[in-house]
Amino acid sequence: ILIALLCTLPFLFFLKKWRRSYSGKTPPPSPPKLPVLGNLHQLGTFPHRSLQSLSRRYGPVMQLHFGSVPVLVASSPEAAREIMKNQDLNFSNRPNLSIPRRLLYDNHDVAFAPYGEYWRQIRSICVLQLLSNKRVQSFRRVREEETSIMVEKIMQLQKTTPTAAVNLTDLLTCLTNDVFCRIALGKKYGGTTTGDGEYHVRSLKKNLAEFYVLLGISPLWEYIPWLEWTRRFDGVDRRIEEVSRTFDEFLGKVIQEHRVRDKREDTTVVGDTVGLDFVDLLLQFQRENERSSSPVDDLTIKAVILDMFLAGTDTTVTALEWALSELIKNPRAMKILQKEVRGVAGSKGEIEESDLEKMPYLKAVMKESLRLHAPVPLLVPRESTRDTKVLGYDVASGTRVLINCWAIGRDSSVWEESETFLPERFLETSIDYRGMHFELIPFGSGRRGCPGATFAAAIDELALATLVHKFDFKLPNGVRVEDLDMSEGSGFTIHKKFPLLVVPTPHACTS
């Protein structure tokens, strides 16, 4: 029997190779996998880094298995272009992920909704009504006011304790939350408000943080279905229910407040919608289309607002935090930027958004920071809707797709000195991060690209320019800039592992 078995094994091996050759299929290169786990054991704490390492061995297009789920990983501009441009329609679907589905009202949002008529209608509403260039510009005053408030907070802290460290990460979080609350909800839910408003403050900040953490969880039972029984013990379901319930109650009250106000003021806006917040606009669209097949019900409004919180706050804070950290760690670049910003500002006390177009180095700094520190390094997963080929390799329908934009941004075959912070590389090139240049895609591209890139850039550029205009920065406790800890945290968005603590000194011309 043993002799027969030994003779059979080579036969089975060659039979498998013959069948693959005969079928004409050319699967992408794939690292060896384990039974049941597939390649899950190779992901580690930082999947974007682990996948970059694997791609250096197996190529820019490779296939892994997360448990029973086939996953295509793209790690080059050419592969990203093929998926997000040449075959955008074939890869426009989203996988049905359990945690986003439950957090976002059964995927009634824009980011995670499956491709189809509902998604097309909702995305169109977001692009045309909420995130158009005209709409972004209409909120310019809000961004400028809240940025000035942040500066005043830093000034007060510095006057009280001139040598004390300031948690810049916290201040940037407050800035983006306050800007977004005013733009989306019509007012801030922060500050010294008392009573019911204070409940909203604590609840909003706490639950937003938990919301972002939960989105970054990939439970093992999602890839290995027979382990689903373990979800009874991991506590994730309870956390999801708590966050979902709190947000549902909060957003329900916000919507009701808008309805009561509109009824009291008999608000019927025709044509001019300047000054309306996102909830106003969505409710107006709901009223105007109540007799049609419009998908905008209250549930959709809540899901879209949560989507906007994710895109408008967490990723924006992440981008600012990394940009400032890189500037502090690279004093030469900081001095160049401060010279540019202060030169444009001249004797003016405040930076205005109209000044930003005169600051090419500022824009280069943001591009370079996003190249090195994409807020969502693997982008939001896609899913193939049909059998197809990617760069000569066969990809089956239903394959999950990850685009490692973090690895693309650090690809030494694309970027000279790819690990070095050099904003100058963008001064003589038209490369941008809006989705047309696939070597720099922190916001994705194509149908499923982030529609809020312009919104995020407006906050990032104004806040960064204002901070370097108003202050000089050093690290607390005598820490040298070259020793600034640039470790990454983990999660859906990749923050610094530790908050950015600085000692700010008001610049002589602005103090």
Swiss-Prot record:
Q: Which family does it belong to?
A: Belongs to the cytochrome P450 family.
Q: Where in the cell is it found?
A: Membrane
Q: What class of enzyme is it?
A: oxidoreductase
Full protein name? Cytochrome P450 71A6
Q: Which PROSITE patterns is this protein grouped with? A: CYTOCHROME_P450 (PS00086)
Keyword Oxidoreductase included in the entry's annotation: yes
Entry superkingdom: Eukaryota
Please give, as recorded in its UniProt entry, the membrane topology of this protein: Single-pass membrane protein
GO terms of molecular function = heme binding; iron ion binding; monooxygenase activity; oxidoreductase activity, acting on paired donors, with incorporation or reduction of molecular oxygen
The UniProt entry's GO CC annotations, sorted and at most eight, read: membrane
Kindly list the positions annotated as binding heme: C450
* Matches recorded under SUPFAM superfamilies: Cytochrome P450
- State the organism of origin: Nepeta racemosa (Catmint)
Q: Which cofactor does it need?
A: heme
Q: What is the lineage of its organism?
A: Eukaryota, Viridiplantae, Streptophyta, Embryophyta, Tracheophyta
Q: Which InterPro entries match?
A: Cyt_P450, Cyt_P450_CS, Cyt_P450_E_grp-I, Cyt_P450_sf
Keywords, A to Z, come to: Glycoprotein, Heme, Iron, Membrane, Metal-binding, Monooxygenase, Oxidoreductase, Transmembrane, Transmembrane helix
Parts of the chain that traverse the membrane: 1-15, 61-77
Q: What is its EC number?
A: 1.14.-.-
Pfam entry (one) = p450
